[in-house]
């Protein structure tokens, strides 16, 4: 009986689709090399996924700046679920970064990798040219639900 109720709840609640991203960010921008702590990269990835509607998120990072002062590119792997698009609503989302929220190249890379996996997002406007770590970036997105 419990199994039937659980199956019914899953069918009624709609479908979810498992997604994942995996990439390495080398940190080359503006003629400079940038390195990041994995905790920062994981937090940024998690926050963008949540903003774009992901659930059941698992983000893993390797490399980066470690306790022994080792500095390597960061490799990110994330798995997450996205709900099926029902087409009943659209949400406008803006993502902005400026000099006070640096790491332009890293943040733009994370956003672009996530967007590659989403069919329900339309990019209306973007400024993603990161000449420097402190460059501004901007994405204006329509997200269908």
Cite the ranges covered by each PLM segment.
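Acidic/histidine-rich, surface-exposed loop or edge segments in extracytoplasmic proteins
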Residues: 18-33, 87-102
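Ser/Thr-rich, low-complexity intrinsically disordered terminal regions
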Residues: 46, 52-84, 91-106, 116-145
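N-terminal secretory signal peptides
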Residues: 19-66
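N-terminal signal peptide c-region/cleavage motif recognized by signal peptidases
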Residues: 13-15
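Positively charged n-region of N-terminal signal peptides that target proteins for export
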Residues: 1-5
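Extracellular/luminal Pro/Thr/Ser-rich low-complexity repeat and linker "mucin-like" segments
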Residues: 35-41, 101-110
